[in-house]
Amino acid sequence: MSHAIDELQAIIADLKTELETEPKSSVGVASNSRLARDRIDRMSAEVVDSNPYSRLMALQRMNIVKDYERIRDKAVAIVGVGGVGSVTADMLTRCGIGKLILFDYDKVELANMNRLFFTPDQAGLSKVAAAAATLSFINPDVEIETHNYNITTVENFDRFLDTISQGGRIAGQPVDLVLSCVDNFEARMAINAACNERNLNWFESGVSENAVSGHIQFIRPGDTACFACAPPLVVAENIDEKTLKREGVCAASLPTTMGITAGFLVQNALKYLLNFGEVSDYLGYNALSDFFPKMTLKPNPQCDDRNCIVRQKEFQARPKPVVIEEKAVSEEPLHATNEWGIELVAEDAPQSNPTPAETPVMGEGLRLAYEAPEKSSETSEETVTAATADETSLEDLMAQMKSM
């Protein structure tokens, strides 16, 4: 009897493994009744209904991104495929990212249905398997790799380290970016340690316990503060890990807050990967007051992570970029005591005769209402005669009147 039970358990284990490795065969995940589109070799900017990349490639035409198709050369690792991580993976897949590497060891539950990604028929599946099936159906051009294990254990941490170090689009190259979408302190510290050791840039993200605020933080080892540079509750209040994890998990969760946080995360990831716009070092969100704080956190010289100290020294040893300052050209006044440039003219200075205006060239059907009279030579002579007469003395005028 016990032998038969062991055989049945072995069969069940094999079926579970097959279910995770072949997610498309799962009921409701990506059923055969839904026909997936064919793979597309190159992104096209052609505006047709059948082109899923036309609106993305329009970013080039609008001079936002220089070469959007470079996104196919990028590999991104997402740790945590929950409320924020699943939506992040969905957005990057729709943007046409080259490769996604998903890490999570949890299963889909009905309690997750208030999120934006998973569906009730996926309950019981591992999150990475369910996500991979759905994402592959959305965009078959994206290479998706899944890892169903806890990265915080010693053995799995080494596997995680090797994956992000050699899992890039080019074999043996590191990933281009790591996105942390986990909900506990221990996992964040594991990601922080791995990225500090391998000198990889990464984004940390999170949503508050009351579900009305969130944040993202861009961490560049040595340049900005790592997650261990400002240790939170564990060091400050000596709280054990179980208590911290219970407090850190969102007791409440809103799909709106998670969607906004995921949107901030992907938006800044795209800006970093495609080199456009300004990447925020820290961006927060408070839903109650619609407040979006931004700041930059400098690394702690006494950080407990020794690799962080090494990266800080390496960053300080780098040559600083030379900033060429343009010298301001001082405009000296025309006159030292006359800043308005007013010029004085003597009363006996010769007056320049104004040049008569030229008759403008009129279009067909147009004529001038009147023409200015031209000064003739006769008019000038009369003027001279009148001026001469005006110079006659009073006695001469009296004599002329008496003789009349």
Swiss-Prot record:
The keyword ATP-binding applies. ATP binds at residues 83, 104, 127, 150, 184. One of its GO terms (cellular component) is cytosol. Residues 372-393 are annotated as: Disordered. It comes from the Eukaryota. The active site is at 250 (glycyl thioester intermediate). One of its GO terms (biological process) is protein ufmylation. One of its GO terms (molecular function) is ATP binding. Zn(2+) binds at residues 226, 229, 303, 308. Belongs to the ubiquitin-activating E1 family. UBA5 subfamily. PANTHER family: UBIQUITIN-ACTIVATING ENZYME E1, UBIQUITIN-LIKE MODIFIER-ACTIVATING ENZYME 5. This is Ubiquitin-like modifier-activating enzyme 5. It comes from Drosophila sechellia.
